[in-house]
Regions:
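Conserved mixed alpha/beta core segments that line enzyme active sites in large multi-domain catalysts
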Residues: 1-223
Length: 223
């Protein structure tokens, strides 16, 4: 954590384009949703030019599926950030480096390298992403009773100057003490209290008082 940030407030990895870029370990913008003005990667010009996103993934709209593959990236294009400026995708998330004045200006201006800073979203409230993430984290942790990990997407409308937030996944984070070392295949069925083919993962919950088992045979919600 930086400055007055707290570990429990979490961090977010932001990137232009499809999420595969983040999954593959691409250079993302890391920020705490409770402190959107404190972004280490954009705190100095040299750091911003060196430590921000330079490429992104986009769908290859010319690929009609003739070379369909199990590779999840077969119909994706990896493009330089400047390519996204052609369709207005950078309007609210990029800044412009001015090599003459040696400064990075929030927003899109002619010429100059485009730097993915999300400044208009994080600092100028074009879209309330930090607040939305705070609420998702708050409600998610309250319901799951532990820190959560989320995946999300946002589309920003340049003409209407608004956007849509999509919550793609939310799951509990398993801490170190919940690591499972037991080989479940070695446990006999007669020694098992409950067994399921579907689960959200393993963990330790120390506040459980009761376990209710519902027989699904003949059960209806009206009962």
């Amino acid at each position: 954590p930086i400055g007055d940030e707290k570990a429990e407030e979490g961090t977010v990895s932001l990137a232009l384009g499809l999420g595969k870029y983040i999954v593959d370990g691409g250079l993302t913008l890391r920020v705490c949703p409770y402190h959107p003005n404190q972004v280490l990667q954009t705190s100095e010009m040299e750091i911003a030019l060196r430590e921000t996103q330079t490429q992104f993934y986009a769908l290859d709209l010319k690929n009609t599926g003739h070379n369909f593959s199990l590779d999840d990236g077969f119909n994706l294009l990896k493009l330089p950030v400047k390519e996204a400026d052609n369709d207005g995708a950078l309007t609210f998330i990029a800044s412009t480096y001015d090599p003459y004045d040696m400064i990075i200006r929030d927003g899109i201006y002619p010429g100059g390298r485009k730097v993915i800073t999300f400044a208009n979203v994080l600092q100028h409230d074009v879209f309330p992403l930090p607040r939305i993430l705070q609420l998702v984290q708050e409600y998610g942790q309250s319901e799951m009773r532990r820190p959560v990990e989320i995946e999300f997407a946002v589309t920003l409308n340049q003409q209407k100057k608004n956007g849509t937030f999509y919550l793609l996944q939310i799951r509990p984070m398993v801490d170190v003490k919940a690591n499972l070392e037991e080989d479940l295949n070695l446990i006999k069925d007669e020694d098992v209290l409950l067994k399921s083919n579907n689960s959200l993962g393993h963990g330790i919950m120390e506040d459980i008082q009761d376990v209710i088992y519902v027989k699904t045979d003949g059960y209806t919600a009206s009962n």
